[in-house]
Amino acid sequence: MTPIFTIDKRGTVRITICLGPWALKLARNATGRRCNRFEADLWARTTEARRNMLCPVLACLPFGVGLLMQRARPLSEDECQHLKTADAFPDWDYVPPDEGHPFEHKASDWGRLSDGRLVAVDYSAPALD
C-alpha cells in the first residue's frame, strides 16, 4: 500500500513531496527550476502519443520553483530490470529539433499511474546539461 504522504530528498536538484494523488517537485536550485520548466514545456508542446509516456503535468509554479504532477507508484528495481530485458519501455521517437530522449531507463525515472500505465516521472535529462 502506498503511503498518503511521502517526501523524497534523494534528488540532487529537486525534492519531491507526494500527497494523495499529487506529486510536487520543488527545485533545490537553478538547475531544479530549469528541470521543472523543461518538463512543463515538454508536456505542453509534445504529441498525444508522446504524452502517453509522460507523467501528467498539472501546473508549473512561476520560475519553475515547483511542478505539480499526477502521482505515480515508483517502479521497483526488479520491475525495471524485467522491462529492460523484455524491451518493454516505451519508444521515444526522435523528432527534430528535439533534444532526444528526455528520460533514462532506470527505476527512479519511471512509475505507474493509478490506471496501471507506465510513465516517465523524471523527463528532464536534457535540462541537466
Predicted regions and their residues:
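ATP-binding glycine-rich loop module of kinase domains
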Residues: 2-48, 62-67
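Short small/polar-residue motifs
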Residues: 13, 51-58, 104-108
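Conserved structural core of kinase catalytic domains
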Residues: 28, 45-90
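Active-site Asp-x-Gly
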Residues: 34, 80-82, 124-129
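Protein kinase catalytic-loop region centered on the HRD/HxD motif
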Residues: 93-100
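Catalytic activation segment of kinase domains across protein kinase-like and atypical kinase folds
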Residues: 100-129
